[in-house]
Amino acid sequence: MAPSQLPPMFNPTPQDIEMLLAAQCHLGSKNLQVHMEPYLWKTRPDGVNVINIGKTWEKILLAARIIAAIDNPADICVISARPYGQRAVLKFASHTGATAIAGRFTPGNFTNYITRSFKEPRLIIVTDPRTDAQAIKEASYVNIPVIALCDTDSPTDFVDVAIPTNNKGRHSIGLVWWLLAREVLRLRGTLASREAEWDVVVDLYFYRDPEAEENKEIAEEAKVPGADEIGAGAVESGFAGENWETQAPGAGVPGTAFAAASAAGATSWEADGADWAASSAAAPAESWAAEAQGAEGAKW
């Protein structure tokens, strides 16, 4: 990194430099656009152009000063048609109050006042000049300044402030937007001092695949505790470890109590049966015979 020409208070901290290197913000493409040559550090033997991250930091500070100079944050429009930058621009807009356009840019947003989505921003910030070419083209028609994250092969036509960085990686895009948002909040006074840590982690600005997150949640829900112990593994790990020889008092002899209860019950039922048999055999038989004989004698 070349010596910085900034005041000492604006110099990046070692942690900022480590984050820029870890996110691979310094790795450009193999192609080099002539207007991006001043931001080039060197070219590796494999042909990859390495960006000077000192220039990247200086341009982040310059862009933050331009953003902080606008009184109404809603007059700033942040745009990203590239999927890796859509989450970042939405988070940047929520933290700084800017207007976000994540996804497809509708032609005529800045030039056709009849459309419902017509906007008149004072400044636009784009993630990639190549994918957001329609927004830059319309901004040039109505004299709107443009700040763009530019790679070594990015076209710089109608771009007023180019932030040299890797605009193709999800981590590099998210980190640059996070650093830009933090610097804007510092200049506005939202953060108490430059030494104060921002409580928003940079991971919130990174792109996340919705399908991958959904599949991860489904896999976590499907994993039930103990599900891996079904089958032979359960016998070896769970049931085999238990002591099946241990018996509770009275265990293993279930017929003892049942036999005693059945014997007592049988005695009482036999006694009742004997009483019923005696009563039915004595009195009812005689009475029925007497009645039958009396009826026959009276009739004949």
UniProtKB/Swiss-Prot annotation:
It is found in: Cytoplasm. GO terms for molecular function: structural constituent of ribosome. This is Small ribosomal subunit protein uS2. HAMAP family: Ribosomal_S2_euk (MF_03015). The gene is rps0. Component of the small ribosomal subunit. Mature ribosomes consist of a small (40S) and a large (60S) subunit. The 40S subunit contains about 33 different proteins and 1 molecule of RNA (18S). The 60S subunit contains about 49 different proteins and 3 molecules of RNA (25S, 5.8S and 5S). Interacts with rps21. Keywords: Cytoplasm, Ribonucleoprotein, Ribosomal protein. The keyword tRNA processing does not apply. NCBIfam families: uS2_euk_arch. Its main location: cytoplasm.
